[in-house]
Every structure is written in C-alpha cells, then in structure tokens.
C-alpha cells in the first residue's frame, strides 16, 4: 500500500505545481499580456504621489514606459499612440473576474 501512495502523492504534487505555473492572459486591441503583468502595472501606477504627478495623471505614458520595472509583455503597448487608453483598459479588465473568465459562475466563458 505504501508503494502505491508515493506515486499518487508525487502525481498530486506535480498537478498542483502545473496549475500554479499556468498564467492567465488578457487579450485587448491585439495585445496579449499576463494578468500578473497588469497587476505589476497597477503597482507602478500606485507609487507615491510624486510619481503620479510626473505621469501627468496617466495621460502621458512615457514615464511609465521608460520605467525598467515595466513588464516586458507590456512594453509593446508603449509603441502604440493609444498607450494610455490601452493601459487604462487593461487595468479595468484585470479587475473584472467575468472579463477574465476565471470565475466559473460567469456566463459566456
């Protein structure tokens, strides 16, 4: 019985690890970014007031785009003339569980 329990325990551990390594992606306006990257974007935008003041109330994303902490999958957004609007939309989408289809109760997923 103990011989069978070890492979089952290992398989269960691998399944848990595999689930934790899968990322949730957000697709918007031709961009595909990780949910974790959008959460990092939120963190960058919630830095002290002096940073937000330099951001020009988020209308000019050049300060954000020059930040080395900006995740690499968000950097292509910086090349778009609508970068500020795209960043705003990504942040909005990331806060809606049904938009992400991660909530089983949501319809249309």
Swiss-Prot record:
<dbReference type="InterPro" id="IPR036382">
    <property type="entry name" value="Guanylin_sf"/>
</dbReference>
<feature type="propeptide">
    <location>
        <begin position="24"/>
        <end position="94"/>
    </location>
</feature>
<dbReference type="InterPro" id="IPR000879">
    <property type="entry name" value="Guanylin"/>
</dbReference>
<dbReference type="GO" id="GO:0030250">
    <property type="term" value="F:guanylate cyclase activator activity"/>
</dbReference>
<dbReference type="Pfam" id="PF02058">
    <property type="entry name" value="Guanylin"/>
</dbReference>
<keyword id="KW-0732">Signal</keyword>
<feature type="disulfide bond">
    <location>
        <begin position="101"/>
        <end position="109"/>
    </location>
</feature>
<feature type="disulfide bond">
    <location>
        <begin position="65"/>
        <end position="78"/>
    </location>
</feature>
<comment type="function">
    <text>Endogenous activator of intestinal guanylate cyclase. It stimulates this enzyme through the same receptor binding region as the heat-stable enterotoxins. May be a potent physiological regulator of intestinal fluid and electrolyte transport. May be an autocrine/paracrine regulator of intestinal salt and water transport.</text>
</comment>
<protein>
    <recommendedName>
        <fullName>Guanylate cyclase activator 2B</fullName>
    </recommendedName>
</protein>
<dbReference type="GO" id="GO:0005576">
    <property type="term" value="C:extracellular region"/>
</dbReference>
<keyword id="KW-0964">Secreted</keyword>
<feature type="disulfide bond">
    <location>
        <begin position="98"/>
        <end position="106"/>
    </location>
</feature>
<keyword id="KW-1015">Disulfide bond</keyword>
<comment type="similarity">
    <text>Belongs to the guanylin family.</text>
</comment>
<feature type="signal peptide">
    <location>
        <begin position="1"/>
        <end position="23"/>
    </location>
</feature>
């Amino acid at each position: 019985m103990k011989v069978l329990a070890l492979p089952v325990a290992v398989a269960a551990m691998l399944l848990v690890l595999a689930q934790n390594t899968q990322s949730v992606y957000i697709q918007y306006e031709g961009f595909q970014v990780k949910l974790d990257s959008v959460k990092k974007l939120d963190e960058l935008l919630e830095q002290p007031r002096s940073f937000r003041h330099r951001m020009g109330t988020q209308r000019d994303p050049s300060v954000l785009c020059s930040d080395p902490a900006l995740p690499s999958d968000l950097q292509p957004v910086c090349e778009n003339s609508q970068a500020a609007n795209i960043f705003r939309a990504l942040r909005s989408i990331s806060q809606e569980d049904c938009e992400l289809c991660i909530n089983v109760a949501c319809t249309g997923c």
